[in-house]
Amino acid sequence: MKRWAGFCGWAAALVLAAVPAGAAAPTYPPRAILLFVASWCAPCHGEIAGLPRLSEAAGPWRVLVVPVDRSRATAAMMAGVPVAQRWTPDAARMAAMREDLFGGTAGLPFSVAIGGDGRPCGAHRGVLSPARVTALRAGCAP
């Protein structure tokens, strides 16, 4: 039942967080891999556990962990992430990011590469591996 409630909450958040047409595209940190997570996403816990390996594969790029909800469980999960690797956009920015990045995404795990120009340049749907981090970086402008 908890799993269903989590899924319904995620789906409702996506529907309710839509940004009005014509809104400006959100800005992103350059040269970063954004790793979207939530406590109800079992593979996300594994990705966080493997964060040192993902960061090593990212080289000079940053791997930033982005919570998709504000639940206590997700906050507890984020407590295990080094402060320098947490990115918690405010609700309005997160809504704009959902509109900009999450189209066609069935759910988590989900990661997005942001190039040197601050624009999305690659996405991965599924568990992120060090090899996939390297491939995402290779597909982006420095």
Model-flagged regions — what are they?
Residues A91-A135:
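Thiol/disulfide oxidoreductase modules built on the thioredoxin-like
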Residues H45-A57:
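Typically the conserved alpha-helix immediately C-terminal to a functionally engaged Cys/Sec
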Residues T27-A42:
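Short active-site neighborhood of thiol/selenol oxidoreductases, capturing the structured segment around
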Residues C41-H45, S111:
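The canonical Cys-X-X-Cys-His
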Residues M1-R3:
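Positively charged n-region of N-terminal signal peptides that target proteins for export
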Residues P60-T74, P82-A92:
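Thiol-based oxidoreductase modules, predominantly thioredoxin-like and allied folds used
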Residues R72-R86, M97-A106:
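Structural alpha/beta surface segment adjacent to cysteine/selenocysteine redox centers
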Residues F7-A18:
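Bacterial N-terminal signal peptides
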